[in-house]
Every structure is written in C-alpha cells, then in structure tokens.
Amino acid sequence: MKIAIDAMGGDHAPKAVVLGAMKAIKEYSDLHITLVGKEEGIRQYLTSEERITILHTDEKIESTDEPVRAVRRKKQASMVLAAQQVKDGVADACISAGSTGALMAAGLFVVGRMEGIERPALSPTMPTVDGEGFVMLDVGANVDAKPIHLYQYAVMGSVYAEKVRGIKNPRVGLLNVGTEDGKGNELSKQVFAMLKDAPINFVGNVESRDLLQGVADVVVCDGFTGNVALKSLEGTALALFSMLKEQLMSSFTSKLAAAVLKPKLMVLKDKMDYSEYGGAALFGLKAPVIKAHGSSNDQSIFSAIRQTREMVAKEVIPTISSVMEKEPLQ
C-alpha cells in the first residue's frame, strides 16, 4: 500500500509530516510513503528512508492563493503532485495539511469525482464526551446542497463509520433545529423523507447541542451549516479549556487542586483531542483524499495516515461505489 503525502502543507511542515510518516512506517509493515516537497527540507528531519520515497519539488500552494487557480496553474506544487500520484495509480491515497480549498480542487480536478456522486463532502471525525466520536458531513465542501447531496452524504458516512471506525449498524442523524419530524427548512424536510427509506440506520433529526453527547455516529448536514457547527464546537471547547486553566491557576489553593486533578484533566483532554481522530476525509472522490488539520503535529499526521490506510485496506471507496449503484436515487 502506498500513500502520497504533501510534505509542504500545514503550519509545522515539513517536520511534523516527516516525523509522522516515519512513525507510521514503523507501525505498519505493509505501508510505503511518498513525501512530496522540497528534498532538502524533508531530509533535515528524515532519519530513516525505509519504505519512504521523496518526490522533490520547490513549488507549493500558499494559504493566500486562490484555490482553483492555484491547482490549475501550479502543476508542480507538492499538493497537486501528491494528488497526481493517485490519479496515475502510483499511490492508493493522498494526504495534505495544506489549504482546504486547494485540496478539494485537487481532489475534484486531479483525482476525480466518483461516478454517481454529485457533490463531494468534507468529513471530519469529531470528539464526544464518551471518547467514541462521530462523523460529520459536510463541513464546507458544498455550501449550497440539494436533497440528493445529503442523501449521498448519509450513505457514504454510514459506510465509512462501519468500515473504518468499526461501528456496526451506525446511527445516522440529520442536523436540524429540533428533533421532531417535520422540523426545519424545506431542504431538511425533503432530506428527512428520503433518509427514512435509505439503506442506513436513520435515527431522525438531531440538534447541535446534543452532538458531543454522541446522539449519532454520523451527522449529516449541508456544508454551510456543518462549517458553522464545526467552528462553534471547536471555539467552545477552546474557550472552556482556557477558562478552566485560568481558574485553576488563579491562586495557590487552586494550583494544588489542579495538581491533584491533573490525571483526570489529561484523560478529558485526550477524549477531546482532535489529533487522535485523524483528518477530514473528502468523500465522493475516486480514491481516498484526506485533509489533515492545518496545525497538525506529528501525532496528528500519524493519525491521518492510520485513517487513510484503513480506508484503503477496508475498501471504503469501492464499497461506497457498490452501494450507490444499488441505490441510484436521482
């Protein structure tokens, strides 16, 4: 199995990417990795070349670049070359912690959209209080969605949750303003009716306030709603941890309490740590394309590689394609 990784993407590239790749190579004996980027920078952190290949390029896509234009014009950019490795059949999947918009463009224009899928979806795995997490899609790939798009998201998310996350008969919920039938705008009502007859375990509407409680294993929404929900959850978590730290450091007594509580607080932090859940998968493409978090450290990159490997090994893309052929809803 071979995975191509954009070694120039992300806030901590290439160091985090190289260290994460070497960790994955040690963990998985069947894995081969191609690091795409400036060779000099990669070799600075590469202590072992076992099953690791470097594809040199000086060009990269910057966060300030217009995504579509950059992908079309910067043919030798590290992200584009990683996607090209997949298109050419040299790699089974690709990963980047670079620009989300550019990776979506590279996925569409280089890797290509899966037959029968109208719009790809960006899907991270979000943490829950029980540590199990849930898959949410879409969180920004397609802000103006149609009912058929959300129907396909539900099916793709269900396949992923079962194959990669090992959840038998995963619960699929529709993000809405209330849990009762008939709630929401016209899009939500139409999607609800479609999902009731879908080949999935649809549990109905779910509200954003209940997401962290693990009310569903897969949460479906349009890209605009999903992006707002995602950033609200991230912001709330950061604010809570910041306030907690401020209070625990406010006096000598509270500092003593913090020392006693530290093991429990670390458990809580680990439960809510996005780095353990891998990256956000771009569903609806011909091969796995994973968007790692922009601030990924080496552990986050390792988790994204582990996630990608599972998608390839468990044949997630062929399974989604097979299910869609059996359910050609238009």
Swiss-Prot record:
Coiled-coil blocks: none
Top class in the EC scheme: transferase
Gene Ontology MF, one: phosphate:acyl-[acyl carrier protein] acyltransferase activity
One GO term describing the cellular component: cytoplasm
Catalytic function, reaction form: a fatty acyl-[ACP] + phosphate = an acyl phosphate + holo-[ACP]
One GO-annotated biological process of the protein: phospholipid biosynthetic process
Lineage top rank: taxon: Bacteria
Keywords: Cytoplasm, Lipid biosynthesis, Lipid metabolism, Phospholipid biosynthesis, Phospholipid metabolism, Transferase
Pathway(s) served: Lipid metabolism; phospholipid metabolism
Subunit structure: Homodimer. Probably interacts with PlsY.
Functional summary from the UniProt entry: Catalyzes the reversible formation of acyl-phosphate (acyl-PO(4)) from acyl-[acyl-carrier-protein] (acyl-ACP). This enzyme utilizes acyl-ACP as fatty acyl donor, but not acyl-CoA.
Family per record: Belongs to the PlsX family.
Protein name: Phosphate acyltransferase
Underlying gene: plsX
